[in-house]
Amino acid sequence: MISPENVVPMVIESSARGERAFDIYSLLLKERIIFLGSQINDQVANLVIAQLLFLDREDPDKDISLYIHSPGGVISAGLAMYDTMQLIRPKVSTICVGVAASMATVLLCAGAKGKRYALPNATIHMHQAMGGAQGQASDIEIAAREIMRQQDILRNILVKHTGQTMEKIVHDSDRDYYLSAQQAVEYGLIDEILQKPENK
């Protein structure tokens, strides 16, 4: 039986040369749109990074849109995406649809200044870095030091892209911290709420 999360819509394009079927993500990629719509792990990061690099190669002067609806995930995978976003030549516009939580919030705020958006009913969420460890006490201590190191990296990224002080970022991310789209604008995580233009 096919599960709904494995169904990818197909789009038929007609031209003088006939019809051609594209999966929806390939069609979006042709329009320089990447969709991050799942938990962040190494496989998802590899796909997003490959798309970013491809679009950089295709046209280094044309913006890329990264739509985000993600609960976050693995920090190292998220940082790989973050570093690639900062490395490539095109400006990456980020758009939160639904929810951007944890690592996804870091990616959302890391978009090009002035091009970070959320839809009106989006939720943005921050918290401390999380992880787990087991084994000998010395192994657990090593793992704890590493997660604290990663947490410092994430906090510095948030400071850089929001303009907030380190003290405020530390305080606000100490526990679950939820923001509406408007609150995210005021916080500096995004620049604008996207609205449908009113008909005149």
Curated annotation (Swiss-Prot):
Keyword line: Cytoplasm, Hydrolase, Protease, Serine protease
EC main group: hydrolase
Biological processes annotated in GO: protein quality control for misfolded or incompletely synthesized proteins
Cellular component GO terms held in the UniProt record: cytoplasm; endopeptidase Clp complex
Keyword Cytoplasm attributed: yes
Pfam family, one: CLP_protease
GO MF, one annotated term: serine-type endopeptidase activity
Reactions it catalyzes: Hydrolysis of proteins to small peptides in the presence of ATP and magnesium. alpha-casein is the usual test substrate. In the absence of ATP, only oligopeptides shorter than five residues are hydrolyzed (such as succinyl-Leu-Tyr-|-NHMec, and Leu-Tyr-Leu-|-Tyr-Trp, in which cleavage of the -Tyr-|-Leu- and -Tyr-|-Trp bonds also occurs)
Active-site residues, as the UniProt record annotates them: 102, 127
Presence of the UniProt keyword Transmembrane helix in the record: no
Known EC number: 3.4.21.92
InterPro entries hit by this protein: ClpP, ClpP/crotonase-like_dom_sf, ClpP/TepA, ClpP_Ser_AS
PANTHER family: ATP-DEPENDENT CLP PROTEASE PROTEOLYTIC SUBUNIT
Family of this protein: Belongs to the peptidase S14 family.
HAMAP family membership: ClpP (MF_00444)
Function: Cleaves peptides in various proteins in a process that requires ATP hydrolysis. Has a chymotrypsin-like activity. Plays a major role in the degradation of misfolded proteins.
Protein known as: ATP-dependent Clp protease proteolytic subunit
Protein's organism: Dehalococcoides mccartyi (strain ATCC BAA-2100 / JCM 16839 / KCTC 5957 / BAV1)
